[in-house]
Amino acid sequence: MSPSQDPSLENYRAIADGIATLFFPHAEVVLHDLRSQRVDYIANNLSKREVGDDSALEDMLEGDSDERNIGPYEKLNWDGQKIRSVSTVLRDSAGQPLAVLCINLNISLFESAKAALDLFLSPSKLIPQPDALFRDDWQERINTFLHGWLRQRQLGLNLLTREHKRELVLALHAEGAFKGKSAANYVANVLNMGRATVYKHLKELKEGGD
């Protein structure tokens, strides 16, 4: 803290440092002193402003302004990168505006990553499943049925009980899933159970139907 800085704002400077550290290097936090209308503190300076610069936040001192959080809103940084910001009005014990804490997050990197993901995951790049490849794809049919069964019951594959697995084996059998040559072994691996247990359930089903 410099000699000209108000010690009453020191806690807010520490908060600014904490936020900037958490989101480093993508976030700048600026503390404006509304009484002096000057920039009091900057953590992780991205905007090239300086402590002591004019804040131009006189409107924040108007008596009828009761806003606490303003934003998020967007602005453009000096280097052309997009910034998303939120400003919080800090008040004293009497409820009077004392300072404004502005968090400025550089979202250009995240937007570039999103654009790359959107391009990579775009459904327009997909073609329908080729019949020649999927006509006899018993693994695909098992996977589709399995996860539909789990969704209906709001279950996770890693949380299945023995009884759940037994019910699922029987349901897969009813769906004709075990017509594939290696289907029993595949189901055993997916459900994390012994192949002998799968055959046991199938045998019980067959004996029960006799």
Curated annotation (Swiss-Prot):
Record's note on what induces expression: Induced by growth on D-arginine and D-lysine.
Pfam family, one: PAS_6
Name of this chain's protein: Transcriptional regulator DauR
Family: Belongs to the DauR family.
Role summary: DauR represses the dauBAR operon.
Any single Gene Ontology cellular-component annotation: cytosol
Keywords (A to Z) from UniProt: DNA-binding, Repressor, Transcription, Transcription regulation
Top-level lineage group: Bacteria
Gene Ontology molecular function terms on file: DNA binding
